[in-house]
Swiss-Prot record:
Membrane topology: Single-pass type I membrane protein
EGF-like domain sequence ranges: 264-304
Record-level GO cellular component terms: plasma membrane
Organism from which the protein derives: Rattus norvegicus
Name the record gives this protein: Tomoregulin-1
Keyword terms of this UniProt record: Cell membrane, Developmental protein, Disulfide bond, EGF-like domain, Glycoprotein, Membrane, Repeat, Signal, Transmembrane, Transmembrane helix
Signal sequence range: 1-36
Lineage summary: Eukaryota, Metazoa, Chordata, Craniata, Vertebrata
Role noted for this protein: Neuron-specific restriction factor that prevents herpes simplex virus 1 (HHV-1) infection in the brain by blocking viral entry. Also able to restrict herpes simplex virus 2 (HHV-2) infection, although to a lesser extent. Acts by preventing the association between the viral glycoprotein D (gD) and its cell surface receptor NECTIN1, thereby inhibiting fusion of the virus and the cell membrane. Also able to prevent the association between the viral glycoprotein B (gB) and MYH9/NMMHC-IIA and MYH10/NMMHC-IIB receptors.
Glycosylation sites (chain numbering): 56, 140
Keyword Nucleotide-binding: no
Localisation: Cell membrane
Length: 373
């Protein structure tokens, strides 16, 4: 047998060659970075959105990151974009006065005045509007500004079950032997922020007010910041009438608010300056009226009358000490004045007698002297 001829594959048709070539070119073009590697240094590649040409669009990306950090869509409600180091920051520049003209925000929180509300809206970038003038009287909040789940307002979390109506975040423990309302309020994570409540007691923070309201199943509101003092009139610390309360539409109150004003008795606004002549003016929003806390020794609607009954009141130990010291100093001063007056009155007659004797001696004439001789 002769030599075997080598096998030869049939020649591919021209159309198949073109198809293979097109697939290879398309695959090479779609490889990541293949387009960027063929670009010359200094440009040629279109950046996303047709905003310029660069190798990797780094400059544009940097600018876009700054814009995304602070622009009109992310810095609203009175905020201003300002440079902060290498980037931009949304700054809320509100110079709020400290007058107590409380307003109720749409998030259920009470703010010291409308400026504080706008500043909170800017800081949290949330739409907060004024829904009522004066503090919020919510069904499940006491105006403490700690969130919609907190507070001791009337009718908060009423649950009707075997326990009866459980209010103020109390829950019915039906599995217990003694079925009743229990309070599972944990105040361990709250910082020390003493407040004076409407029951005349001081609490370490607003959370303990809610806990006491839950345990006692009665409404206890926060009157003012700080411990209760002797000047707090317990007659003014009564409970608010449920009929006077207002429940605004709550949008979002999950954040802590440091701009929230606490209490239902506030100092009067500037337009009521001089309302109390001898006392402190307080505005009670539950009645929408101003009242006066008169100083010691004064009475009347505007503290304009002198209270003479104060003369018969036994002062405290500290005040009694001051009274005794003042009495001793006054007695010493009176004694000194009396002594000076007595000395003057005693010396004057002697001087007068001496002057008269001298005058009489001067009246001797020459005739009287010759007679004596």
């Amino acid at each position: 047998m002769g030599a075997q001829a080598p096998l030869r594959l049939p020649a591919a048709p021209p159309l198949a060659v073109c198809g293979y070539t097109s697939v290879l070119l398309l695959f090479a073009f779609c490889l990541p970075g293949s387009g960027a590697s063929n670009q010359p240094a200094g440009g040629g590649g279109d950046c996303p959105g047709g905003r310029g040409k660069s190798i990797n669009c780094s400059e544009l990306n940097l600018r876009e990151s700054d814009i995304r950090a602070c622009d009109e869509s992310s810095c609203k409600y009175g905020g201003v974009c300002k440079e902060d180091g290498d980037g931009l920051k949304c700054a809320c520049q509100f110079q709020c006065h400290t007058n107590y003209i409380p307003v109720c925000g749409s998030n259920g929180d009470t703010y010291q005045n409308e400026c504080f509300l706008r500043r909170a809206a800017c800081k949290h970038q949330k739409d907060i509007t004024v829904v009522a003038r004066g503090p919020c009287y919510s069904d499940n909040g006491s105006g403490s500004g700690e969130g919609e789940e907190e507070g001791s307002g009337a009718g908060a979390h009423r649950k009707h079950s075997k326990c009866g109506p459980c209010k103020y975040k109390a829950e019915c423990d039906e599995d217990a032997e003694n079925v009743g309302c229990v309070c599972n309020i944990d105040c361990s994570g709250y910082s020390f922020n003493p407040v004076c409540a409407s029951d005349g007691s001081s609490y370490n923070n607003p959370c303990f007010v809610r806990e006491a309201s839950c345990i006692r199943q009665e409404q206890i509101d926060i009157r003012h910041l700080g411990h209760c003092t002797d000047t707090d009139d317990t007659s003014l610390l009564g409970k608010k009438d449920d009929g006077l309360q207002y429940r605004p539409d709550v949008k979002d109150a999950g954040d802590q608010r440091e701009d929230v004003y606490i209490g239902s008795h506030m100092p009067c606004p500037e337009n009521l300056n001089g309302y109390c002549i001898h006392g402190k003016c307080e505005f009670i929003y539950s009645t929408q009226k101003a009242s006066c806390r008169c100083e010691s020794g004064y009475t009347g609607q505007h503290c304009e009358k002198t209270d003479f009954s104060i003369l018969y009141v036994v002062p405290s130990r500290q005040k009694l000490t001051h009274v005794l010291i003042a009495a001793i100093i006054g007695a010493v001063q009176i004694a000194i004045i009396v002594a000076i007056v007595m000395c003057i009155t005693r010396k004057c007659p002697k001087n007068n007698r001496g002057r008269r004797q001298k005058q009489n001696l001067g009246h001797f004439t020459s005739e009287t002297s010759s007679r004596m001789v």
